[in-house]
């Protein structure tokens, strides 16, 4: 039955339920043990992730809970599209096809141990089939994408406009096609492997320019480094663009409201 067995898929979905969802078990412990197992099985994977894994574990658990929920409801189109985008985006981390193989093995073993008595033949069949689907879609989408895995660029300007706000301009090594209102994941040299989302404040530039507005977040390592420590000549790495924020230019008047650096994507749209 595998992916047709809603009861077996429901067991897998509930294993990843958020801890505050009123369900038995501890998905946080499951995900923590999965990463521990994966890093032991394939030590090369550890260097792809940031030192602090808390946010990564939460995001991974939420993603799998949603994917399995969609499979229970027999809605495959959105999960497949989501996993394909995830696979394409993971190229920026240096993820290789063999990493997906070890991920599937580690997650299957961790689920078997975590579910204990609930691990039946039907659940194992559903787990194997679903994990093959998840890793296969991600790996296949990554292989099929002919675009750059990332864009590198050099900081050419850093303007400290206030105590906690900076405008950073870069010259990319090659043009990045994106739509105004989209956002990218950014890695700065002061904080390796700690990626943060930023919205370009200008439309895509054929001349390879790009601009970001960054406000210092108290306690935030990356925003503090960008505002306080970024200098011309620094090399940044950017992911492929995500999301979409569009204006119907054939419609009526539009009122745009933004606060702080939230103005950046609106500025790009207006420009």
Regions found by a protein language model. Give the residues of each.
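Short, glycine-rich nucleotide/cofactor-binding loops
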Residues: 254-264
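Low-complexity, polar/charged sequence tracts that form flexible coils or short amphipathic helices
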Residues: 247-250
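Core of compact, soluble alpha-helical bundle domains
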Residues: 1-151
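Fold-independent oxyanion-binding glycine-rich loops
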Residues: 240-241, 259
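Histidine-anchored nucleotide/phosphate-binding helix
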Residues: 265-271
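Short alpha-helix boundary/capping motifs
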Residues: 28-29, 220-223, 263
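Ferredoxin-reductase
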Residues: 147-235, 241, 252-253
């Amino acid at each position: 039955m595998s992916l047709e067995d809603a009861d077996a898929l429901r067991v897998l979905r509930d294993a990843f339920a958020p801890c505050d969802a009123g369900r038995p078990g501890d998905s946080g412990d499951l995900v923590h043990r999965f990463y521990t197992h994966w890093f032991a099985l394939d030590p090369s994977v550890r260097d792809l992730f940031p030192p602090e894994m808390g946010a990564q574990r939460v995001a991974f658990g939420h993603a799998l809970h949603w994917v399995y929920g969609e499979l229970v409801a027999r809605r495959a189109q959105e999960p497949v599209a989501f996993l394909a985008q995830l696979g394409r985006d993971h190229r920026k981390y240096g993820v290789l096809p063999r990493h997906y193989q070890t991920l599937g093995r580690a997650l299957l073993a961790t689920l078997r141990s975590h579910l204990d008595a609930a691990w039946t033949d039907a659940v194992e069949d559903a787990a194997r089939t679903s994990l093959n689907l998840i890793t296969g879609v991600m790996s296949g989408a990554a292989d099929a994408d002919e675009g750059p895995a990332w864009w590198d660029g050099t900081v050419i300007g850093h303007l400290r406009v206030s105590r906690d706000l900076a405008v950073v301009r870069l010259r990319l090594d090659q043009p990045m096609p994106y739509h105004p209102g989209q956002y990218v994941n950014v890695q700065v040299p002061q904080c390796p492997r700690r990626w943060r989302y930023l919205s370009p404040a200008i439309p895509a530039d054929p001349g390879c320019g790009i601009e970001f507005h960054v406000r210092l977040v108290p306690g935030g390592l990356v925003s503090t480094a960008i505002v306080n420590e970024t200098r011309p000549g620094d090399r940044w790495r950017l992911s492929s663009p995500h999301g979409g924020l569009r204006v119907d230019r054939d419609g009526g008047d539009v009122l745009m409201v933004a606060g702080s650096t939230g103005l950046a994507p609106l500025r790009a749209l207006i420009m």
